[in-house]
Amino acid sequence: MSHIELDSPIHCRDPIVDLDWPPRFRATMANSVFPRLPGFRDFPPEEYALRAHICEAWRRVARRYGFLEYDGPPLEPIELYVQKSGDEIVNQLYSFTDKGDRQVSLRPEMTPSLARILGARSRGMSKPIRWFSLPQLFRYERQQRGRLKEHFQWNVDVIGEAGLAADAEILAVAIDGLRELGLTSEDFVARVSDRRLVQVLLEVVGVPEDAVAGTLAIADKLGRKPESSVREMLVADLGFSDDLAEQVLAVFLAPSLEDLDVQILSDSRVSERITSFHEFVARLNAMGLGEYVEVDLKIVRGLAYYTGVVFELFDRRGELRAICGGGRYDRLLELVGGEPLPATGFGMGDVVLGELLADRGLVPTFQRKLDYFVVVVSAQERPEALRIAQALRESGKSVAYSLRDQSLLKQMKAAGREGASVVLIIGPGELERGCFIARDMTSGEEREVVLSDLM
């Protein structure tokens, strides 16, 4: 065995600095801190407070509706998204080949992961399954207001229930998630549609069955692109005649179902679907949520797996992108090898919602809060201060103290910075009498107390 002589020089290598970094990285390390990647966020306490405020509201609402929380891995096989999510998301994947030569991706959405999780275990579970999650998701897309390369998302799903009651329940959860944060019907609207109804409408006006999916994908761009551009895409990409393109646009741009062409409304397939859709809206009215809901056939959702009722939530002023989107996806579990189960759900991101709360003055002011700050007059009282602090912490109180010897004035200033409600002052006299002084930091009132008074 080799050994080092005590008088021989020892050379310690820094495993980071000594790596053969390219010159531009060496310059970065030498001259400045590493920059944050574009489109990603840091969460110091002041910023984390808003994220926590949003997520806690989401959790409260989900639990009031009887949903259970779950999670999954942030890294999944890329096939889960290539086969199930549609081209738009596939083009935004953070994907790579891992050391096991597997094609993998950071999750861009949660629903395929949910389908995979349930595909392995749903057969033995009682239905309906009510689950929710708060994953961090990643998409390589252009950064703009309300859109980053990562975000936290509230996913809520009902699995195993095919009826419209589940669709109405899911949308009610989404609406209540925003109301819980102080938003009202003057702040946001839920625009709803039904892919089954839209598909029948397209067939009635003459869209070939094999062109329906492409038509929905193009129609999803309405609102983001001019109508003229969408019309050109229908003609150029799908080979529609000018007349058919106009009829398709008339369907999607109808102000209400009653404004559709009379000949279209007379078709029995259309009337059957409209009756079903009216039942869905009636349930929301019965829940007192009708003022939040508008029918909008342009809402088709871009993801390929949606099969029925779909919806998106928008701010009323139209200044932000969609706050939330969701709908029915009855075949997704089957597509990942699981039991064929009906399902409906939504995802709501924290980035655009944070923007909306800020615009409406609903972001809570960040305040540091601490129950007690323990102050000692001299080092002699330190052991007693530690005993008191630990006893209070064990009783569930938040307690801090200076970690170095400081003057009484500096300790009091530190208590103020920490947001302490009460300062506990221990001096030689108090130590001798087995008590201490409690000073209310708001009123300035002082009283002599013993530990049991605070427990």
Task: Locate each region found by the language model.
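Polyanion/phosphate-binding surface patch
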Residues: Y70-V104, R147
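Positively charged, Gly/Ser-enriched RNA/tRNA-binding surfaces
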Residues: E47-Y65, E76-P77, G100-D101, T111-R123, ...
